[in-house]
Amino acid sequence: MIGLVGKKVGMTRIFTEDGVSIPVTVIEVEANRVTQVKDLANDGYRAVQVTTGSKKASRVTKPEAGHFAKAGVEAGRGLWEFRLAEGEEFTVGQDISVELFAEVKKVDVTGTSKGKGFAGTVKRWNFRTQDATHGNSLSHRVPGSIGQNQTPGKVFKGKKMAGQMGNERVTVQSLDVVRVDAERNLLLVKGAVPGATGSNLIVKPAVKA
């Protein structure tokens, strides 16, 4: 089953009939318009390409305009692709609504996490700080040794060090679907999802459900 592209609206909470408070993220999933269907004969794999939302005409490049015109759909804010499972069929120009998730219990949500800028190891990797006193001078938040000796004589790849934090692709798995509001194009999932308000999210049925 394919996924859908939505936009993060924000967080709120809803109450069950028993009075239990459930924290939810509201995702606006406008109709995803099919712009291209890829097949084994022409592309070597089966997939569906979609767009959603809208984009100013002045912001649409000529190649994009041609691509959208060929599909007969309004220019959207981007293009996304989902692999097709055996038996799944879509046609160019078709609209796919949030009702796709009506029977889905859990979803995986992918987004771009909020950027935090250049961060040290304490904030970025949860390193513990060194002694506040006992002779420690100006080394309270430094990472400490990053290597060994003449052997191996190098710093290993992937070593946790200071650097850019956030602003990376993150997937949160197996979030409960609390409500599907097809009338208002809203999907409510339990818990938090990556990204800032207004950012794009890819919602797929959970692989571990």
UniProtKB/Swiss-Prot annotation:
The keyword S-adenosyl-L-methionine does not apply. Methylated by PrmB. Keywords: Methylation, Ribonucleoprotein, Ribosomal protein, RNA-binding, rRNA-binding. The modification N5-methylglutamine is found at residue 150. The keyword Electron transport does not apply. One of its GO terms (molecular function) is rRNA binding. Residues 132-153 are annotated as: Disordered. GO terms for cellular component: cytosolic large ribosomal subunit. GO terms for biological process: translation. PROSITE patterns: RIBOSOMAL_L3. InterPro entries: Ribosomal_uL3, Ribosomal_uL3_bac/org-type, Ribosomal_uL3_CS, Transl_B-barrel_sf. Part of the 50S ribosomal subunit. Forms a cluster with proteins L14 and L19. NCBIfam families: L3_bact. Belongs to the universal ribosomal protein uL3 family. One of the primary rRNA binding proteins, it binds directly near the 3'-end of the 23S rRNA, where it nucleates assembly of the 50S subunit. This is Large ribosomal subunit protein uL3. It comes from Enterobacter sp. (strain 638).
